Amino acid sequence: MATASALVPAAPATRVSTTDVFRNGRFEANDWPILGDADAFPSEGQVIVSFARALDLLSGDVLGNRRIGVIVGPADKVAELAPHVDRLAVVAIDFPKYADGRGFSQAVRLARLGFAGEVRAIGNVLIDQIDFMRRVGITAFEVSHAVTRRYLEAGKDPAPGLYYQPS
């Protein structure tokens, strides 16, 4: 469960999906919508659930062989997913605020666990962060920011061709 401290306050979690996802240089239909905690878990279909709900589902026998997606918030303990990483298809890393860079660290931790599915950025996804998100393994982006959407729709990929000083 996500926890806050005096130094790192909790940010509101992203709990609503966009209708499309930017991946492979274009917007595609969002095939993994976010399911709210109060919503009934569907008997079929692909859904992304909260971190706590995912741990509950993965610990029980409700899923069978079914794979799910999980939202990882800035304060969630990614290591808790280690025993279940092969049962996850999508991990949506929440970026609740521009100034909160913990999602980048979460993506690195996820890669160290050996997760091989789609890593998706959700929340406050802005054009100047996308290249840095790609560098830590994020491959898909739910973009609700109007300016970022316009840039991406126009084919203005933020990835520079030359790095003078890598981050």
Go through each PLM region and give its residues:
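Catalytic cores of alpha/beta
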Residues: 73, 78-83, 126-140
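Hydrophobic faces of well-ordered beta-strands that scaffold small-molecule active sites
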Residues: 45-49, 66-72, 89-93, 117-121, ...
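Glycine-rich phosphate-binding active-site loops on the catalytic face of alpha/beta enzymes
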Residues: 136-156
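Phosphate/adenylate-binding glycine loop and adjacent helical scaffold
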Residues: 3-29, 33, 64, 74-76, ...
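Glycine/Thr-rich beta-alpha phosphate-binding loop at enzyme active sites
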Residues: 65-109
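A positional/architectural concept
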Residues: 31-64
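Non-catalytic positions within long, well-ordered alpha-helices that form the structural scaffold/packing
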Residues: 111-112, 134
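Active-site-adjacent beta->alpha loops and helix N-cap segments on the catalytic face
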Residues: 52-58, 98-110, 149-159
